[in-house]
């Protein structure tokens, strides 16, 4: 029997839920889909975020009574190799939006394998990459040529 698997929803352990929710909702446009039932915002221990067909869960890394005053840098180092990749047809627009919101990142770059990518880190140090297949100059020339032909055909009909 074939497996019917639909979607995925990663779970990230975060140091400060309010900071993480603010980042994912206010900066990246996610909305809160569900929360734990025994807390009041912004003191949730668990949230389920959704943006279109992208799902992400956040859980506090510590129970409130055991949370240290500041994040342990070793904890961030342990997930330094974790990165969430988001499909973003207009990577430059994502970059501009992040800059408008005061989020620092390097400018998008085209990887050797042809993906235009923008990397940054969330408040807990998890890697985030917004990417899309980069158009080659030849593809852009062909698209422009096809658009001009379409315009010319419409002009001849009118």
Region roles according to the model:
Residues 2, 11-56:
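Core segments of cupin and vicinal oxygen chelate
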Residues 34, 119, 130-136:
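Short beta->alpha transition motifs characteristic of CBS
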Residues 1-21, 81-84, 133-158:
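N-terminal beta-strand motif that seeds the catalytic metal site of vicinal oxygen chelate
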Residues 36, 69-75:
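Short, P/G- and charge-enriched loop/turn segments at secondary-structure junctions
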Residues 14-18, 63, 77-124:
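Vicinal oxygen chelate
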């Amino acid at each position: 029997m074939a497996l019917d698997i639909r979607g995925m929803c990663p779970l990230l352990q975060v140091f400060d839920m309010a900071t993480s929710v603010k980042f994912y909702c206010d900066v990246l446009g996610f909305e809160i889909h569900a929360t734990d039932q025994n807390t009041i915002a912004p003191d949730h221990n668990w949230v389920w975020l959704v943006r279109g067909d992208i799902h992400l869960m956040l859980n506090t890394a510590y129970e409130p009574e055991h949370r240290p005053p500041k994040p342990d840098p070793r904890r961030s180092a342990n997930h330094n190799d974790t990165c969430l990749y988001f499909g973003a047809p207009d990577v430059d627009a994502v970059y501009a939006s992040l800059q408008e919101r005061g989020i620092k990142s390097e400018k998008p770059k085209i990887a050797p394998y042809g993906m235009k990518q923008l990397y940054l880190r969330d408040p807990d140090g998890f890697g985030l990459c917004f990417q899309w297949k980069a158009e080659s100059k030849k593809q852009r020339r062909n698209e422009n040529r096809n658009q001009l032909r379409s315009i010319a055909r419409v002009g001849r009909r009118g």
